[in-house]
């Protein structure tokens, strides 16, 4: 059994590493810490363009339909770079809508989560 990553996942890892190094350096993150939102919306839009927000969302709703292990590659590399972006929260929110939402809710919200137009977070009380 092979427990390593696939070639595609390794290419994704390289893409995330490059993004964190070139677009979201530690110096940039330090700057973002002083902003009210805590992150740069233009970088969020770039993440969306790269498809990271759509990884686990069904293609029917604008996603890529990949597995959670693919998302894990993104989360691992962004965490190494101290990413301030709510990528996991976004993925968990979309998974909740996908598993519990009505068809109308899925059609309304999942495309907006996939393209980064909307940011959601989960809270447990």
Model regions and ranges:
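Intrinsic disorder at enzyme termini
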Residues: 1-8
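A non-catalytic, amphipathic alpha-helix used as a structural packing/dimerization or gating element
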Residues: 11-18
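Glycine-rich flavin
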Residues: 21-123
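Short, flexible segments with low predicted structural confidence
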Residues: 1, 18-19
């Amino acid at each position: 059994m092979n427990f390593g990553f696939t070639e595609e996942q390794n290419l994704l890892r390289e893409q995330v590493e490059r993004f964190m190094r070139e677009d979201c350096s530690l110096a940039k993150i330090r700057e973002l810490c002083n902003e009210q939102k805590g992150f740069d919306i233009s970088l969020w839009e770039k993440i969306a363009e790269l498809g990271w927000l759509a990884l686990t969302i069904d293609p029917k709703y604008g996603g890529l339909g990949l597995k959670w292990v693919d998302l894990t590659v993104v989360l691992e590399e962004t965490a190494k770079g101290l990413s301030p972006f709510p990528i996991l929260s976004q993925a968990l929110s979309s998974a909740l809508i996908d598993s519990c939402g009505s068809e109308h809710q899925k059609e309304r919200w999942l495309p907006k989560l996939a393209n980064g137009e909307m940011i959601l977070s989960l809270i447990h009380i």
